[in-house]
Amino acid sequence: MKIYHIPAAPPLYTNTFLLVGENGLAAAVDPAAGAQEYLRLLEQEGARLTHILLTHGHYDHVGAVEELQRKTGAKVWLAPQDACGGELFPFTTPDNAYADGEEIRVDTDLAFRVIATPGHSAGSVCLLCGGLLFSGDTLFAGDVGRTDLPGGSWDTLRKSLKKLCAAVTENVQVLPGHEEFSTMDRERANNRYLQF
């Protein structure tokens, strides 16, 4: 498996990712804006985008979805709670809804386990892929996602963080939706929001 970090330009500053499996099947995680870089990397790898996996539906995580879907035929995964449309949630029609705990297999060496983590938004999920945790806006390095936006709830996020810590016991790399990367061990030790 190969992974490409594609940071979105200002003002979004979203961490987005393209993962390519050994047989050339690929997944995009939170393609924020500008489909061109994804398409260039897919061509460079001789890969085919089959999955677009969204950690939640906020505008700064979905900007390239429509163009990527149109140009590649990839299917979109998103929790139905976040497919509602509006200012913060552009209308994104998912082809598939997440089920908590399900495995989404993209290629023989590329699979994601879904961990439902509502709180930042009603439909937020984290995606565990081997030693990588795509945490969206649920967990950041030293911080957590805000809960003052529509669909957000601090009480729900706290429960989700406890669940996440219980579900991810190994020291995986945390790849959040914004800012720097971290590890679960570092977050357990230093993130005040994970001190239960």
What residues fall within each predicted segment?
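Active-site HxH/HxHxD metal-binding segment of metal-dependent hydrolases
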Residues: 12, 33-110, 192-193
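The start of beta-strands in P-loop NTPase/AAA+ ATPase cores
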Residues: 25, 49-51, 74, 131-132, ...
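Short beta-strand or tight-loop elements
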Residues: 2, 108-113
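Conserved beta-strand hairpin/beta-sheet module of binuclear metal-dependent hydrolase folds
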Residues: 1-45, 126-136
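Hydrophobic residues in well-ordered beta-strands that form the structural core
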Residues: 29, 76-80, 135, 176
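Metallo-beta-lactamase
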Residues: 88, 92, 111, 116, ...
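Residue in the alpha/beta-hydrolase core beta-strand immediately N-terminal to the catalytic nucleophile
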Residues: 27, 53, 115-116
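Hydrophobic residues at beta-strand termini and immediately following loops
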Residues: 6, 98, 117
